[in-house]
Curated annotation (Swiss-Prot):
GO terms for molecular function: ATP binding; sulfate adenylyltransferase (ATP) activity. It comes from Synechocystis sp. (strain ATCC 27184 / PCC 6803 / Kazusa). One of its GO terms (biological process) is sulfate assimilation. This is Sulfate adenylyltransferase. PANTHER family: PTHR43509, SULFATE ADENYLYLTRANSFERASE. Pathway: Sulfur metabolism; hydrogen sulfide biosynthesis; sulfite from sulfate: step 1/3. It is an enzyme of class 2 (transferase). Keywords: ATP-binding, Nucleotide-binding, Nucleotidyltransferase, Transferase. Its EC number is 2.7.7.4. Belongs to the sulfate adenylyltransferase family. It catalyses: sulfate + ATP + H(+) = adenosine 5'-phosphosulfate + diphosphate. NCBIfam families: PRK04149.1 (NF003166), sopT (TIGR00339).
Length: 390
């Protein structure tokens, strides 16, 4: 049994593909040495890839000024579609000055390898403080997302892009499932409702609980850990992926779960990033998206449920993906199971609250997270990694 892929429409109705056809690729390679170059950092490189594979549909390139300003101020594109986070290529004045609008620009990765081209349609200055305050709700440069804005150049380069080649991920090639492939997988399994789960943390019992709650009411679960750029104190992606492999192998029904990597970078934009993450999963073919406590947050910049409440600012049909909102789950010592205030009669003294932050703190102190926090196999994997034994 299969379901129509058209029933799970990408954002804007069409899955964008900006992988250069072979003929164009050869043309770009032939003129590569004659093109002006822009070197991309890790985040811009992952943005380039996400645009090319359709993860950022309907974007075909880095945002022009009208889209950028509407996204920053009103969380929508110039065509009216919801979009909450700017996707821009910011460079210094020195890099921007010689570039001519209407020309091709060679895009190199941080190692200097030619990976894509930009058809330059605009160069424009932008207000860093305005972007920070609107997107991140703060201009505090201690915020990692705000710091990126202030560290990057003052000029945005805009225009459609082409990615020369979709290379296998160096660490997780078997889990590199791009949007066209995930949609096909969902259809082959006959899934009509699919819930996506975003994380940058190792899986703990609270995650497992809300994932399984969601799985009770949909056909399939798409575990989609982010493996792009994150904060330096986040658990490394290879460790997180091993933890997810352990969980899928031992604690989930394999026929109802697909594990794949999300190559995009974290912005730590809290509520706005929750919308962004939901739209990405819509492009991958998900019909539902899990939004938990302080989704995509950092520090104390956002309220516990701000990332859930922001969904109420959009018409459901405009987003086209259903948020599944979960309260902060905890281990209940009274009922001896995972619960939330909706299902547990216990008082605060009988609740063990879990978080990736707490797990990281235990690991840094050389302590094995207790079974209320983490499955034992996952805890062992984490402690091995922290001790440098992996």
């Amino acid at each position: 049994m299969t379901t129509s892929l058209a029933a799970i429409a990408p954002h804007g109705g069409q899955l964008i593909n900006r992988l250069a056809p072979e003929a164009e690729r050869q043309e770009f390679l032939a003129i590569a040495d004659k093109l002006p170059r822009v070197q991309l950092d890790e985040r811009a490189t992952s943005d380039l890839v996400m645009i090319a594979i359709g993860g950022f549909s309907p974007l075909k390139g880095f945002m022009e000024q009208d889209d950028y300003e509407l996204v920053v101020e009103e969380m929508k594109l110039s065509n009216g579609l919801p979009w909450s986070v700017p996707v821009t290529l910011s460079v210094t004045e020195e890099v921007a000055a010689p570039l001519e609008v209407g020309s091709w620009v060679r895009l190199d990765n941080s190692a200097g390898k030619f990976i894509g081209v930009l058809e330059l349609t605009q160069k424009y200055h932008y207000n860093k403080a305005h972007e920070a305050k609107n997107v991140y709700r703060t201009d505090d440069q201690a915020h990692p997302g705000v710091k990126v804005i202030y560290d990057q150049g003052p000029v945005n380069l805009a225009g459609p892009i082409w990615l020369l080649e979709r290379e296998p991920h160096p660490l997780f090639p078997k889990y590199q499932i791009d949007p066209a492939a995930s949609r096909q997988l969902f259809a082959e399994r006959g899934w009509k409702t699919i819930v996506g789960f975003q994380t940058r943390n190792p899986i703990h019992r609270a995650h497992e609980y809300i994932q399984k709650c969601a799985l009770e009411v949909v056909d399939g679960l798409f575990l989609h850990p982010l493996v792009g750029a994150t904060k330096s104190d986040d658990i490394p992606a290879d460790v997180r992926m091993r933890c997810y492999e352990i969980m899928v192998d031992n604690y989930f029904p394999k026929e109802r779960v697909i594990l794949g990597i999300n190559p995009s970078a974290m912005r730590y934009a809290g509520p706005r990033e929750a919308i962004f993450h939901a739209l990405i999963r819509k492009n991958y073919g998900c019909t539902h998206f899990i939004v938990g406590r302080d989704h995509a947050g950092v520090g104390d910049y956002y309220g516990t449920y701000d990332a859930q409440e922001i969904f109420d600012e959009f018409a459901p049909e405009a987003l086209g993906i259903v948020p599944m909102k979960f309260e902060h789950a905890f281990y209940c010592k009274k009922t001896l199971q995972m619960a939330t205030t909706k299902t547990s009669p216990s008082g605060p003294e009988d609740r063990i609250h879990l978080s990736g932050t707490k797990v990281r703190a235990l690991l840094r102190d050389g302590q094995l997270p207790p079974p209320e926090f983490s499955r034992p196999e996952v805890a062992q994997e984490l402690i091995r990694a922290m001790q440098g034994e992996s």
